[in-house]
């Protein structure tokens, strides 16, 4: 056993012990701890900003893009927003102990199915240090211990944020080891985390497709896939074109670097002449680079010829792949071929078309006459989320507090025997 493997197993063992102590704690105890964390973030803002500045300076030296540097950067205002988000989690209902269903059996036994924590959750994520706090707060509220493995590009930031959280927990009833960083910057530590079966109950990767696929392919621990969003908007032949244009622009440009932004626009041939010239002009004015098929390029010669790779790409930028289709079924076939199963939208005034699209498209969220940008725990009214699950087990769609639990059955009898 290497030193790195030994270190990873040590933190996982401590997390397992902490999870056992955390699981039975009351909501008051957990909320008290989260309030202490939020207060500590505000009190130690200067220290957090200083640590983050080291990461940002190193990122610039390494030639990281400005978009990635923006994700990495923590300002006093952003730290305040992170602390506010922790307070919002305090206000959310505690899912632990919730009775999912219950009944009295014919033999008189009382049966209840109740929510319980998953146990130890490993979070593997890229260069967004706010995830350190968000993930820790959500896991604590749902009664889980958490092991955090962020990007090496945010190592200084994640280290100080984890220290802030742990020092805040030290004065509360929540065990300090309920929140730990996986030691080291090397990929070897990630490898050993992914193989800590029996100590870690589930891994949740947050980041790009490459990170997620690496974890899915190499982990011996159950994985919940989150985030990759090759989202589609289909403008049907029965669409209100003014409404469609508004939704297309919002889905792509309101915030292009997030997983629920649209990446491909599919337009029915029956309305292409009326819709595409307007849509292409307004998208271009908004700074969007269009990658289109031959029919799209016939409306605008400046459109970049689309390749097979474009249809499968999650750009996370002001780029959009555009294709003309001859039918709703052709749009669905395209989505089935290239979608990441995150969010797809249909714009139509035809109830029959909407019903068919909803029934045929197999994604975590399907929008009818609404922007893909609404796939979000907060927008759905669920509160904060750990990510958007694009798989079917154990959760699908926005993963809030209930999705960070499992269930167990409690059966109460009066001396019953079988």
From Swiss-Prot:
- Write out the pathway annotation from the protein's UniProt entry: Amino-acid biosynthesis; L-proline biosynthesis; L-glutamate 5-semialdehyde from L-glutamate: step 2/2
The record's HAMAP family line, in alphabetical order, gives: ProA
Reactions performed catalytically: L-glutamate 5-semialdehyde + phosphate + NADP(+) = L-glutamyl 5-phosphate + NADPH + H(+)
One GO cellular component term of this record is: cytoplasm
What Pfam families has UniProt attached to this entry?
Aldedh (PF00171)
CDD domains cross-referenced by the UniProt entry: ALDH_F18-19_ProA-GPR
SUPFAM superfamilies linked:
ALDH-like
Catalytic activity, EC: 1.2.1.41
Q: Where are the transmembrane segments?
A: none
Q: Which GO terms describe its biological process?
A: L-proline biosynthetic process
**PANTHER family per the UniProt record, alphabetical:** DELTA-1-PYRROLINE-5-CARBOXYLATE SYNTHASE, GLUTAMATE SEMIALDEHYDE DEHYDROGENASE
The protein depicted here goes by the name Gamma-glutamyl phosphate reductase
Task: Indicate the enzyme's highest-level EC class.
Answer: oxidoreductase
Q: State where the protein is found.
A: Cytoplasm
Q: Which Gene3D superfamilies match?
A: Aldehyde Dehydrogenase, Chain A, domain 1, Aldehyde Dehydrogenase, Chain A, domain 2
Query: Single GO molecular-function term?
Result: NADP binding
Annotated PROSITE patterns: PROA (PS01223)
Family classification: Belongs to the gamma-glutamyl phosphate reductase family.
Task: Summarize the protein's role.
Answer: Catalyzes the NADPH-dependent reduction of L-glutamate 5-phosphate into L-glutamate 5-semialdehyde and phosphate. The product spontaneously undergoes cyclization to form 1-pyrroline-5-carboxylate.
| Keywords recorded for this protein, A-Z | Amino-acid biosynthesis, Cytoplasm, NADP, Oxidoreductase, Proline biosynthesis
